[in-house]
């Protein structure tokens, strides 16, 4: 009897182990813990865009055609006037602006200068700038940006930009032929701007009351962050105001705030799984879906519609001695063709791999698939939100 009992126990243990392995295999994967700095950002700690208008000089004959871009010569005249040089001497007949309008400059280009002022930037810090042609310059390669003030949205000057440009493209032309690689009408200057004014510290003005803004609104993730912060710093440190904003009680002293924020940003939180969503790009035909998308059983019939337009020139020749003129006309033939589409069964998909397999079985192009997905959503077979960008 004892060997029989032992065998039964071993069999029961094996069945229990197999059941546990099956449960683990089919259980949904737990969300991976992420750092808080990857899930949210501190309100007020952000970049600030800067913009300015300036001139690039030293171009090898590839600058603006000044007869077509009068603002280039006007800007150059204003800059020279600020340097004490006047070019509007005029003539005896009173042509006060003839010198400016007759300037044929090929080595100058009007440009827009943009930069990003990082948070907590101090005067004297160097930042990168991007220089983009505003007129019809062929290339900015080899040019030098003259001193350009960069302003913020409030109209204040926050940085001054100047320096030699680095253009990633290259091009050559001869006898009407032209070869170009990459973009020649824009370039960058590494460290080309010096910060002259700092943005007021928004964190220091909050008197120890900070707010976290989640990158993606989710009530579950917000609650998990509150629980993690309160477990690490004590009860009452964090309070969720809504699904995106969390209020924090931080030390009022700036030195303690740095240590508090450094510890806070490295907290690991497991975010909630994202809502099922399908992104459709109507311009490029791209379709992206996340892992939460599922399908229900449905039948799909989709026929391709094609339009073919064939245009041929037709010459109408007048008779001899008729004083007529030869006329060239266009003769067009238009064909409209629609392929027959039969119903196809699309099986249900419980995960992303099954959904991809089911959609690929239709054999539709991305453009057709966009219409099919919208119809599936309307029929209730697609369990996801559709977003067209």
UniProtKB/Swiss-Prot annotation:
Residues 1-33 form the signal peptide. One of its GO terms (cellular component) is bacterial-type flagellum basal body, distal rod, P ring. GO terms for biological process: bacterial-type flagellum-dependent cell motility. One of its GO terms (molecular function) is structural molecule activity. It is found in: Periplasm; Bacterial flagellum basal body. Its main location: periplasm. The keyword Signal applies. Keywords: Bacterial flagellum, Periplasm, Signal. InterPro entries: Flag_FlgI. NCBIfam families: PRK05303.1. The basal body constitutes a major portion of the flagellar organelle and consists of four rings (L,P,S, and M) mounted on a central rod. Assembles around the rod to form the L-ring and probably protects the motor/basal body from shearing forces during rotation. Belongs to the FlgI family. HAMAP family: FlgI. This is Flagellar P-ring protein. It comes from Burkholderia pseudomallei (strain K96243). The gene is flgI.
């Amino acid at each position: 009897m004892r060997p029989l009992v032992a065998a039964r126990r071993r069999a029961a243990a094996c069945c229990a182990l197999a059941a546990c392995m099956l449960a683990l295999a089919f259980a949904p994967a737990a969300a991976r813990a992420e750092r808080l700095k990857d899930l949210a950002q501190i309100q007020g700690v952000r970049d600030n865009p800067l913009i300015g208008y300036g001139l690039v000089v030293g171009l090898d004959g590839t600058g603006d055609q000044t007869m077509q871009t009068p603002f280039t010569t006007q800007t150059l005249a204003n800059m020279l006037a600020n340097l004490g040089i006047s070019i509007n001497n005029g003539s005896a007949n009173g042509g006060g602006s003839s010198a400016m309008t007759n300037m044929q400059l090929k080595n100058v280009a009007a440009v827009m200068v943009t930069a990003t002022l990082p948070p907590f930037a101090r005067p004297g810090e160097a930042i990168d700038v991007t220089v983009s042609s505003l007129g019809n310059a062929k290339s900015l390669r080899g040019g030098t940006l003259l001193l350009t003030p960069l302003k913020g949205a409030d109209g204040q000057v926050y940085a001054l930009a100047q320096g030699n440009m680095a253009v990633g493209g290259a091009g050559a032309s001869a006898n009407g032929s032209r070869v170009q690689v990459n973009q020649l009408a824009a370039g960058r200057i590494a460290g080309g701007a010096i910060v002259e004014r700092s943005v007021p510290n928004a964190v220091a003005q909050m008197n120890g009351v900070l707010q976290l803004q989640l990158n993606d609104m989710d009530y579950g993730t917000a609650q998990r962050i509150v629980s993690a912060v309160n477990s690490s710093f004590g009860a009452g440190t964090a309070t969720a105001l809504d699904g995106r904003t969390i209020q924090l009680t931080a030390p009022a002293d700036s030195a303690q705030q740095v240590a508090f924020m450094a510890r806070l940003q490295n907290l690991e939180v497991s975010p909630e799984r994202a809502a099922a969503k399908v992104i459709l790009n109507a311009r490029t035909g791209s379709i992206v879906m996340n892992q939460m998308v599922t399908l229900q059983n449905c039948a799909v019939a989709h026929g391709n519609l094609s339009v073919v337009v064939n245009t041929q020139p037709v010459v109408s020749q007048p008779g001899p001695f008729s004083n007529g003129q030869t006329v060239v006309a266009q003769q067009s033939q238009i064909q409209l063709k629609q392929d027959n589409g039969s119903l196809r069964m699309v099986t249900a998909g419980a995960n992303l791999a099954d959904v991809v397999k089911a959609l690929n079985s239709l054999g539709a192009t991305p453009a057709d698939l966009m219409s099919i997905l919208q119809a599936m959503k309307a029929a209730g077979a697609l369990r996801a939100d559709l977003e067209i960008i």
